[in-house]
UniProtKB/Swiss-Prot annotation:
Keywords: Methyltransferase, S-adenosyl-L-methionine, Transferase, tRNA processing. It is an enzyme of class 2 (transferase). The keyword Transferase applies. One of its GO terms (cellular component) is cytosol. GO terms for biological process: tRNA methylation. This is tRNA/tmRNA (uracil-C(5))-methyltransferase. Gene3D superfamilies: 2.40.50.1070, Vaccinia Virus protein VP39. It catalyses: uridine(54) in tRNA + S-adenosyl-L-methionine = 5-methyluridine(54) in tRNA + S-adenosyl-L-homocysteine + H(+); uridine(341) in tmRNA + S-adenosyl-L-methionine = 5-methyluridine(341) in tmRNA + S-adenosyl-L-homocysteine + H(+).
């Protein structure tokens, strides 16, 4: 965390983020941002700890940024979900009591959900065998979780290799598979607010949506209910498979998902060359009115930015307001900001998630 965990200072820290976003978007005539706050504690649904040996025992540990040698021992973690905090001492007691579970265990990862699901990944510097699997199965049953053991590129799965999340958007509950090791939004309460904002911002449409960087379908599912059809792109195989499962589970049947990068999609739309992965998809049949982007921290590269310019509306979720501002600067001659928002995904840090709806001038 970049700032001390202090719930009493939360409002002050949030005000500073709002001021920073206003400052970055002021050159573009942005309206006042809608602000979506976070729970003050127990908001983070995932956590990762190294294990540190001290006084003959292994402890949960984290490290200060830039210092991998001075461990900060962790007994509880108030920013993490209540489920993670409840699991931490029970898991620690299990590895301390069991040679099979504790031997050469060096890292533990927790993933929980608002729906009450939980998964624990245990990482080892040794091969895992049947003896480990027997004890891990007992552990999973005792804790009511899925357990995954990892060792040198191999993994053993006890239960499922994904957690199930359920999010309510405009009165409809969407179910999501969140695969082990894949990206998920860490702050479930704020993610739900973010989905609701995007759902409202796009409005009820009679045309089509193009989505870049769709991940596991976090935004795809609710936004698909607002448009005629969706073409969504993603390059991660794990995320693509999760998104396909999520579409099927939620009976969302107006989405085509293709494994293409933004650069490849640009080439396809410009008819530079054909792609086998687009076989059976007629790009000319789509009437894209909106493009939705949720890029990595680096923002959109200049070519992707130019791709979005051809659309009347650009719905942009950003995890880095500086690169968001840089992208808007590239687009401001053709698009204006109609609405914007700040989502406090990461309390007690300088990081913020933001969203803008850009509309053609």
């Amino acid at each position: 965390m970049s700032a001390a965990f202090d719930p009493s200072s939360y409002a002050t820290q949030l005000d500073a983020k709002v001021a920073r976003l206003r400052e970055l978007l002021a050159p573009f005539g942005a309206p006042e941002p809608a602000v979506f706050d976070s729970p003050r504690e127990h908001y983070r649904l995932r956590a990762e700890f190294r294990l540190w040996r001290e006084d003959g025992q292994r402890h949960y540990a984290m490290f200060a940024q830039g210092d991998k040698h001075k461990a900060i021992l962790i007994d509880d973690f108030p920013i993490a979900s209540q489920r993670i905090n409840a699991l931490m001492p029970r898991l620690k007691a299990a590895w301390q009591a069991s040679e099979e579970l504790g031997n050469r265990l060096f890292q533990v990862e927790f993933l929980t959900t608002l729906a009450g699901d939980a998964m624990i990944t245990m990482c080892y510097h040794r091969p895992l065998d049947e003896a480990w699997e027997v004890e891990a199965r007992q552990l999973a049953e005792a804790l009511g979780v899925s357990v995954i053991g990892r060792s040198k590129g191999k993994r053993l799965v006890i239960g499922r290799d994904y957690a199930i999340e359920e999010l309510d958007v405009a009165g409809r509950v969407f179910s999501y598979r969140q695969p082990e090791g894949a990206f998920t939004q860490p702050n479930g309460a704020v993610n739900q607010k973010m989905l609701s904002w995007a759902f409202e911002a796009i409005g009820e449409r009679e045309d089509d949506l193009l989505e870049l960087y769709c991940g596991n379908g976090n935004f795809t599912l609710p936004l698909a209910t607002r448009v005629r059809q969706v073409l969504a792109t993603e390059i991660s195989k794990t995320s693509v498979n999760a998104a396909l499962s999520n579409l099927d589970e939620n009976a969302v049947d107006n989405v085509r998902l293709v494994r293409l990068s933004a650069e490849e999609l640009t080439q396809a739309l410009n008819e530079v060359r054909p792609f086998r992965r687009l076989e059976g998809i007629d790009l000319k049949s789509y009437e894209f009115g909106t493009v939705f982007v949720d890029p990595p921290r680096a923002g959109m590269d200049p070519d992707t930015c130019e791709l979005t310019r051809r659309f009347e509306r650009i719905l942009y979720i950003s995890c880095n307001p500086e690169t968001l501002a840089a992208n808007i600067a590239q687009l401001q001659d053709t698009h204006r900001i109609e609405r914007c928002a700040l989502f406090d995904q990461f309390p007690y840090t300088h990081h913020m998630e933001s969203g803008v709806l850009l509309v053609r001038r």
